[in-house]
Design a protein with these regions (language model features):
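Core catalytic alpha/beta fold that binds nucleotide/phospho-ligands
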Residues: 1-167
């Protein structure tokens, strides 16, 4: 419900959201949104926040993560060797890094909208030092072998990180 309200506020009118077979949301053509204005839509939420990102065309990805979550499972499941190498020994910094890496990979996953993605092998986030906002450098290796470089914007909101990518 909060997402529909956000979309209506963003477009200053009632807007229809539909979902593709893979669950990816999109904004519908119609009186509310003429064909030339078709927008990609990505949605994320936690208990406290809901967020959306739109972009022309069909690619947009956003994720939101609460920092109170235990991200150690992420380190085992979703990080590649090159990402594990730059993780801090400081627990607080490590948590911020893991949260941002996971958030970035979820945003890339939504952006690419491909099935059966191996988060540890097909997606990489370049080394970084966590700030309150910034841009991460991500790569996504598609199943056809083509690698895309993706700039991932991020912002810290209280005890959450939000990461988004559009293109």
């Amino acid at each position: 419900m909060a997402v529909r309200v956000l979309v209506d506020i963003l477009f200053d009118r009632h807007t229809i959201i539909q979902y593709r077979d893979n669950g990816k949301p999109f904004l519908v053509h119609g009186k509310e949104l003429p064909e030339k204005e078709l927008k990609a839509l990505s949605i994320a939420h936690t208990r406290r926040f809901a967020c959306i990102v739109t972009a022309p065309g069909d690619k947009a990805g956003i994720d939101l993560e609460c920092l109170s979550r235990n991200f150690e499972a992420v380190a085992k499941k979703a990080l590649g060797k090159e990402e594990k190498v730059f993780l801090s020994d400081n627990l607080q910094q490590r948590t911020l890094q893991l949260a941002l890496i996971w958030c970035a990979k979820e945003a890339m996953f939504k952006y690419m909208s491909q099935e059966e993605v191996d988060f540890s092998k097909q997606m990489t986030v370049a080394p970084f030092f966590p700030e309150t906002e910034g841009v991460l450098s991500g790569t996504f290796q598609q199943q056809n072998g083509i690698t895309l470089l993706l700039p991932l914007c991020y912002k810290k909101l209280d005890d959450h990180f939000m990461v988004w990518v559009t293109g």
